[in-house]
A protein has these predicted regions:
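Residue-level recognition of conserved beta-strand positions in structured domain cores
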Residues: 67-69, 136
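N-terminal beta-strand motif that seeds the catalytic metal site of vicinal oxygen chelate
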Residues: 2-28, 85-90, 140-149
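Core segments of cupin and vicinal oxygen chelate
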Residues: 11, 18-63
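A generic structural micro-feature
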Residues: 9, 48, 80-82
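Vicinal oxygen chelate
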Residues: 2-10, 14-23, 43-44, 53-57, 76-149
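Short, charged/polar surface micro-motifs in flexible loops or helix N-caps
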Residues: 60-64, 71-73, 95-96
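Short hydrophobic-acidic sequence motifs that mark active-site Asp/Glu residues
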Residues: 64-66, 131
Length: 149
């Protein structure tokens, strides 16, 4: 039973994140800089509860982010305690390149991650107020990668 559960859990991966934004092109500026190997996979026009919106799928053959341009108002206050998305994170093999590409595209680091000898991480705010973390692991050992010292 334990082997079956372990095998099934390894088959589950995150396919996509669906984000409501205000401007798809501004949003793509950020994500294209972060993910130069990703592309717009498709898109179109749809309606969400009576409001028309444009949408795109931006990613690769296996994972993507959906951007829908029917957003109004501001994203949640990241310093507050409202229910909602705090941040999401992506693993990279070269965090310095991600930082450099985002800087060239006009995006500065919002905050540095905590000092840890097994990983480096930084946080950016995308054009819609979503906090996006990038992390580079400096070890292949799970006990080191997942250390909380």
């Amino acid at each position: 039973m334990e082997t079956k559960r372990l095998t099934e859990s390894k088959m589950i991966t995150l396919e996509h994140i669906n984000l409501v934004v205000t401007d798809i092109e501004k949003t793509l500026t950020f994500y294209k800089a972060a993910f130069p190997h990703w592309a717009v996979r498709g898109g179109g026009v749809s309606e969400w509860h009576g409001k028309p919106r444009n949408w795109v799928h931006f990613g690769d053959d296996y994972q993507y982010i959906t951007f829908n341009d029917d957003g109004v108002g501001d994203n949640r206050d990241l310093t507050g305690h409202q229910v909602g998305l705090a941040h999401f994170a992506f693993v990279t093999s070269n965090i310095k390149s991600v930082i450099e590409r985002l800087a060239i595209a006009g995006f500065a680091i919002d905050k540095e991650g905590a000092d840890n000898k097994y990983r480096e991480n930084v946080y950016f705010i995308d054009p819609n107020g979503y906090e996006v973390e990038f992390v580079q692991y400096l070890s292949d050992l799970p006990c080191e990668r997942n250390s909380y010292d």
